Amino acid sequence: MKKISVIIPCFNATKYLPKCFMSLVQQTIGIDQIELIFVDDASTDGGATWNMLQEFERAYPESIIILKLEENMRQGGARNIALQYATGEYIAFVDADDFVADNFLLETYEKAKESDADIIQFEYFYYTDRLGAVDSGRNVTPEVIKISSVSERKKFLISEKVTYGCWNKLYRHDLLKKAHTSYAEHVIYEEPLFVYPLLYFADKIVILNDAYYYYRQNDAGTMRNDMKQEETLKMHADVQLAVWNFMKKTPFFQEYYDEIKLYFLHTYLYETLYFAKLRGFQPSYSFYKKLEKTVLAEVPDYAQSIYNALIPKQMELYRMIGEGMTEDDFKGYWERL
């Protein structure tokens, strides 16, 4: 068994893929200790991405698996397929336009083994070709989070110490098998459906302030452009609704209802609107009303929470829902958001 499987979804990726590849094969843990799974997500570059992946496989046939999808499934679908092939003790995810420090896998693996962690979360740099690496600006305190009771998990869940992105973490493979989580497919912002449920299954999470990952900031990036469109903004909400529906089927839903509700209402409604605001894009009133309709159907007690004091901005929105938000009300709220 390899120590770590690293999954890399690729779509028309030849511009940055070589740098990503070299950062992985030069890992100080040793190429023989890792399994790299590259997935060509139905690239449309005339076979250029696939040809490059074939070259990688020929160079390291014992450590590289390449998969070619006939249908574009976006990053979530590509990762789901790759997980079916992964054999490593731990799992990591790297995007094809990003790269990692050469000690990334060795240090995170050693810390995972030393602490018997289910999840290791680490820090990252932003990266552009013009500026190089830029500190993320996150102020993180290293911590070992042990969860052995319901009250401890509740406290952890509202602490927001763990982010919902997938690539700044190392995961115990057995944890993923136990949780049966998967990524949302054919959408952007696919990661929460995979990451959020894991927080209910993990019993030990290690937070590091060491940065190993270089997250490329690309103006042509999928997320940045797509979130300016109402159709793809809806994908964000749909993924959060999928998280809610997943959690309803778990044994955790009743015991952690307040925490799951807090997460769902924040991400499905408030965060969807806030993301649009950040991108200078105002969705239509009809778009908002569809979100509101789902909230009323799924969470009739949306305005009642033991955590109300923690979310004043969200509570303003919830109060306006209760009063019957008109189109003029929505425009006014948007200006204040």
Model-derived features: positions:
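Cell-envelope/extracellular polymer assembly enzymes that use nucleotide-activated donors
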Residues: 3-5, 35, 193
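Acidic donor-binding segment of Leloir-type glycosyltransferases
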Residues: 21-68, 113
